[in-house]
């Protein structure tokens, strides 16, 4: 009788041990499945992010003058780039992309001196009048001039225009930049809220003298 009780007790212990073992296996399998699901989700998110990044890089900016980029003039930092012609709205305000050779862009931001006018360093400076002149270095004659429009693109605001220029060669780009005061922009001058700087009264001139231009097949 005593032996039967011992045998029964051993049987119960064995059954309990097997049940615990099966339970542990189930937990491990579920955890592994969850981890696999998380890894798959992470991979998918990473892939989507990569695709999105590739889609946003749909154009290549070309420096007008590599040796004279990001020039400091007065309170401004000025650079010039170009890329494929683009369509803009409202229509009719500039040359159609189909009729242009490229889109010429002036990136103009406030530098440290520009903070005296109330801009943050690196901020886009709006309401400037930006006149451009493209000069053939071989003849010193203008081959195109006008006034840039201000506009927004996916990478931020800038000044620009679609330009027609078919002839390869060495050119000089000259920008003449008039202050926002011309368009009625005002500055606070009181002791409590005023700025310490003053708008420039004569146009600021920026020159990109070494533009080695080659027409592109966009």
At which residue positions do the language-model features occur?
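Short acidic/polar inter-strand loop motif in beta-rich domains
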Residues: 178-188
């Amino acid at each position: 009788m005593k032996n039967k009780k011992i045998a029964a007790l051993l049987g119960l212990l064995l059954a309990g041990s097997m049940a615990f073992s099966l339970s542990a296996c189930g937990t491990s399998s579920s955890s592994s499945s969850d981890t696999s699901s998380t890894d798959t989700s992470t991979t998918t998110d990473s892939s989507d992010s990569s695709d999105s990044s590739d889609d946003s890089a749909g154009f290549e900016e070309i420096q007008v003058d590599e040796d004279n980029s990001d020039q400091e003039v007065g309170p401004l930092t000025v650079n010039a780039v170009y890329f494929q012609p683009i369509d803009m709205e409202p229509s009719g305000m500039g040359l159609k992309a189909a009729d242009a050779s490229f889109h010429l862009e002036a990136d103009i931001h406030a530098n440290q001196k520009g903070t005296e006018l109330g801009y943050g360093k690196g901020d886009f400076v709006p309401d400037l009048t930006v006149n451009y002149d493209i000069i053939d270095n071989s003849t010193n004659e203008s081959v195109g001039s006008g006034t840039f429009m201000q506009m927004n693109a996916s990478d931020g605001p800038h000044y620009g225009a679609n330009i027609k220029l078919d002839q390869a060669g060495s050119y000089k780009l000259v920008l003449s930049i008039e202050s926002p005061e011309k368009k009625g922009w005002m500055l606070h001058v009181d002791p409590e809220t005023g700025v310490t700087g003053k708008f420039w009264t004569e146009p600021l001139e920026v020159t990109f003298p070494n533009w080695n231009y080659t027409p592109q097949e966009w």
